[in-house]
Regions:
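Beta-strand cores of modular interaction/reader domains in eukaryotic scaffold and signaling proteins
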Residues: 107-112, 132-135, 196, 234-238, ...
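Gly-rich Lys/Arg/Thr-decorated short loops/hinges at beta-loop-alpha junctions or inter-strand turns
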Residues: 68-73, 197-210
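Class I S-adenosyl-L-methionine
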Residues: 249-305
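Conserved beta-strand elements of beta-rich interaction domains across eukaryotes
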Residues: 113-118, 138-141, 200-202, 241-242, ...
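Intrinsically disordered, low-complexity glycine/charged-rich regulatory or linker segments
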Residues: 1-187, 311-415
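A short acidic, Gly/Pro-enriched loop at the edge of an enzyme's catalytic core
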Residues: 180-196, 203
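Conserved Class I SAM-dependent methyltransferase catalytic core
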Residues: 208-263
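A short acidic (Asp/Glu
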Residues: 117-123, 144-149, 206-208, 245-251, ...
């Protein structure tokens, strides 16, 4: 797993936290050439929108952990979690040695969590009925398919009574609510051992503005986490691109509050997308009393300013060091190159008229990678999967993929000792 350790920032930078808007949307401030190259190649995806959603699963090395193998009715992993985010959390916790072995009960909070894959992973790893796991996500009252609520989680919630759903003061589960922010701070301030934030949108129709569109939700998740985090605790946050000043500011803020902050992309995250994770370990503050007013002020300004002619530009009112910026450019170069290569490979596969043999080889290789991943993280897997020659559809057809990793099932294949906890590499 590729990962970068960010430079530490002075701990009193919280005094410079602010919400700053400008009249125009700002251009990228780092890695400009990479930004525009990604912009161009992502636009090529639009040409093959239908085919892309199929063939991206062939070029993703770890797709078949949770996705049905072509011409088969099963995937590599026997375990069927609430969502494929379960596998990402298993991988992140193990690789970064997030402590899940405490003999004392722990408290965890999971922001933008529906349908519950991150909580499910922690519940499995801990296997403690005296822990408290709290999930908060936007409540969907209109059956919006783009809002991953708790609909699939009924069986899981019934089996795990120590998983609590928090809907906030207004009952909406909306993180971008000032009332909910104040309420969560009063209820859970400085008390959480482990926090996750997995917020996102359906970006399929707007790849190019992912980073900007995520800004407010990203910052909202961060201020919630900082207010709730217990001293010594850990936080895992999903991010996307990092070209804009506001994203850089958020990473700098996190680097000032934690001993170690990493940026990484799990193997179970599709290589052709912009998704990455920030892993923060060792929270430095004993309470939030000193920094809460600064977070409240900036968050209040952000959620109350709905002027469509104004654009968020900064969350810090001071410049950052050249060293910090250069490290982010280094990480952009590595992750960006990997993403470009996988997008290019997928588009080339789509355009290839004689793709059957190539697809067959990809599937065979990727199945073995998925099996090795399951072995590494002690996840039960189907070890009698075979792919016969000439089992694929003609190149003029499109394979039929169906997901089973996004539906909840009973976990009879898991033994008490198959927890998914292994020593990191």
């Amino acid at each position: 797993m590729i990962h970068f350790l960010l430079p530490r920032i002075q701990p009193n930078i919280y005094k410079n936290i602010d919400y700053i808007e400008e009249n125009e949307k700002k251009d990228p401030v780092i890695s400009n050439s990479l930004f525009f190259y990604l912009f161009d190649i992502k636009n090529k995806i639009d040409i093959y929108e239908k085919e892309w959603n199929i063939y991206k699963k062939y070029t993703n090395p770890y797709e078949f952990i949770h996705t049905n193998i072509p011409m088969k009715k099963r995937c590599v992993c026997k375990y069927k979690p609430l969502s494929r985010s379960y596998f990402k959390m298993i991988e992140l916790i193990n690789f970064f040695q997030i402590n899940m072995n405490s003999t004392l009960p722990i408290k965890t909070f999971h922001l933008a969590e529906g349908p519950g894959g991150f909580i499910e992973a922690v519940v499995k790893l801990r296997n403690r009925k005296d822990d408290s796991y709290i999930g908060m996500t936007l409540i969907d009252n209109e059956n919006n398919s783009n809002i991953p609520g708790w609909k699939k989680s009924e069986i899981f919630l019934n089996e795990n009574k120590n998983v609590i759903l928090e809907n906030g003061m207004d009952g909406t589960g909306n993180i971008l609510s000032l009332d909910n922010f104040v309420y969560v701070n009063e209820m859970y301030g400085s008390s959480m051992d482990f926090i996750t934030a997995d917020g996102g949108f359906d970006f399929s129709l707007d790849f190019d503005n992912q980073e900007y569109n995520m800004t407010k939700l990203l910052y909202g998740q961060v201020v919630y986490a900082l207010c709730m985090q217990k001293m010594g605790g850990s936080f895992i946050l999903k991010v996307f691109d990092c070209f804009m000043q506001q994203t850089i500011d958020i990473l700098a803020i996190l680097s000032s509050f934690y001993e170690d902050v990493y940026i990484t992309k799990p193997q179970t995250s599709r290589y052709a997308n912009s998704e990455k994770y920030v892993v923060c370990k060792g929270f430095k503050q004993t309470t939030n009393h000193n920094f809460y007013p600064f977070l409240y002020n900036s968050f209040s300004k952000m959620v109350s300013n709905e002027n469509p002619t104004k654009f968020v530009s900064n969350f810090l009112n001071i410049p950052l060091s050249y060293f910090f910026i250069s490290k982010l450019e280094e990480y952009n170069a590595i992750f960006g190159q990997q993403q470009i290569e996988y997008i290019h490979t997928t588009i080339t596969l789509i355009e290839n008229k004689y793709k059957d043999f190539k697809i067959e080889n990809l599937v065979k290789i990727n199945i073995q990678k998925c099996i090795q991943w399951c072995i590494k993280y002690q996840i039960p897997y189907n070890n009698n999967i075979t792919i016969n020659t000439n089992t694929f559809l003609s190149s003029s057809s499109t394979p039929n993929f169906s997901f089973i990793g996004d539906s909840f099932g009973r976990h009879n294949d898991i033994t008490p000792h198959s927890t998914g906890v292994v020593a990191p590499p």
